[in-house]
């Protein structure tokens, strides 16, 4: 149990997808204007990561891993296309659920919801799972923790950006300029966790 708690804390704070690996920055910067929208996207990313990492773990271990289907069969060359296909299917299902049950959130996320399919944070989580050889339970914990970490980062940035609307930002830095600086300072803050050994 201790190992899983350690993995969860590490994936949220120490190995934060957005602020340590800088994955998913396109949606991270574009959607972080309002806390409510950022929280909705963060929940969507967390759900997709929590489901796609373990599902891709099963697909990898049962079909793609060298020797999974037979002693001399190696299908690892299909990793990328298979992982992206599984992620795309899960995002499509999530999109249909949001459209049916949460129309305001679906409309607020707009084009960024289908972009979760190609969000490198999602694919990065799946790739790290394969690279680190996580088992199924570790994949569930890692996927959930990575999603929560990404959501924490985007909601924090959105909160700061909402407060900056009322600040006197120099004209040359308004918009994405000050957002990049803010994200960089947040990343420095998360770097303080890098020395923590769990």
From Swiss-Prot:
Cellular component GO terms, alphabetical: Gram-negative-bacterium-type cell wall; plasma membrane
Name used for this protein in its record: Na(+)-translocating NADH-quinone reductase subunit E
Documented EC number(s): 7.2.1.1
Taxonomic path: Bacteria, Pseudomonadati, Pseudomonadota, Gammaproteobacteria, Vibrionales
Enzyme class: translocase
Family under the similarity heading: Belongs to the NqrDE/RnfAE family.
Reaction(s) catalysed (UniProt annotation): a ubiquinone + n Na(+)(in) + NADH + H(+) = a ubiquinol + n Na(+)(out) + NAD(+)
One GO biological process term: respiratory electron transport chain
Domain of life: Bacteria
Subunit structure of this chain's protein: Composed of six subunits; NqrA, NqrB, NqrC, NqrD, NqrE and NqrF.
Species in which this protein is naturally found: Vibrio anguillarum
Pfam families, per the entry: Rnf-Nqr
């Amino acid at each position: 149990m201790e190992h899983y708690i350690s993995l969860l804390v590490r994936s949220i704070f120490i190995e934060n997808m957005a602020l340590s690996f800088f994955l998913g920055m396109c949606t991270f910067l574009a959607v972080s204007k309002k806390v409510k929208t950022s929280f909705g996207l963060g929940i969507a990313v967390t759900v997709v990561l929590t489901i796609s990492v373990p599902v891709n773990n099963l697909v990898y271990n049962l079909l793609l891993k060298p020797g999974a289907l037979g002693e001399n069969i190696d299908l690892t060359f299909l990793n990328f296309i298979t992982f992206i296909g599984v992620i795309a299917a899960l995002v499509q299902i999530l999109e249909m659920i949001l459209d049916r049950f949460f129309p305001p959130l679906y409309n607020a996320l707009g084009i960024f919801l289908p972009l979760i399919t190609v969000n490198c944070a999602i694919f990065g989580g799946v790739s790290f799972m394969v690279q680190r050889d996580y088992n199924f339970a570790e994949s569930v914990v890692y996927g959930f923790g990575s999603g929560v970490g990404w959501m924490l980062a985007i909601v924090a940035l959105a909160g700061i950006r909402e407060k900056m609307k009322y600040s006197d930002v120099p004209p040359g830095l308004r918009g994405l300029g000050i957002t990049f600086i803010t994200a960089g300072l947040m990343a420095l803050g998360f770097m303080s966790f890098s020395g923590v050994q769990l």
